[in-house]
Every structure is written in C-alpha cells, then in structure tokens.
Design a protein with these regions (language model features):
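Short, solvent-exposed charged binding patches
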Residues: 73-90
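A detector of short terminal or domain-flanking linear segments
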Residues: 1-20
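Amphipathic, hydrophobic secondary-structure cores in small proteins
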Residues: 16-73, 78
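Short linear motifs in intrinsically disordered/low-complexity regions
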Residues: 11, 37, 89-90
C-alpha cells in the first residue's frame, strides 16, 4: 500500500453531536472519520443516524461512543471479507 495510512488532517478532529435517544438528549464524541463513515452506513441502510444509534444503544454493554466505533469497525470488516482489498492475492 502506498501513501500514509494515518495522514494528519480533519479526519482526526473530535466532533460532538447531540441526538435524542429513547427520550433523552445524548451527546456523542467521535473523530470526524468515524462520523463520516457512520453517516454513510446509515444512508446505505436507508435509515437516519438517530435510528441506527438507538438500535446500537439498546444492545451495547460499553459506552455509546465506543459501541459506535466497534459497530463501524465490524461493518467494515464484514464488507472487507465479502469484497477483498485490491491487490489481495490470497
């Protein structure tokens, strides 16, 4: 793979967003890169971010920000298994 994987930039900026989940106002902090990916996942599912967060919130055992990051990682891992990376000769 060429180029820096962790190039400094806006993707690392920590953003706080507020949502109303289960009748309560909730603030969630994640890096911009995670928010961008989460937004794309919700859109691909035809759902709002709030609805997807509510589902994850109902099933989580850890902090909500952590649960969202793990959810994003697991979705990306599942997608990578069904669509191998370019140049993967295995």
């Amino acid at each position: 793979m060429s180029g820096p994987i962790l190039a400094a930039g806006d993707e690392e900026e920590l953003l706080r967003r507020s949502f109303r989940i289960a009748g309560h106002q909730t603030s969630i902090s994640m890096e911009r890169a995670f928010w961008d990916q989460f937004r794309a996942m919700a859109a691909a599912d035809g759902r709002s971010m709030t609805d997807l967060i509510a589902d994850i919130d109902a099933q989580r055992s850890a902090g909500l920000s952590r649960a969202l990051r793990v959810y994003i990682l697991k979705r990306l891992q599942a997608a990578a298994q069904t669509s191998p990376l370019i140049g993967d000769n295995s």
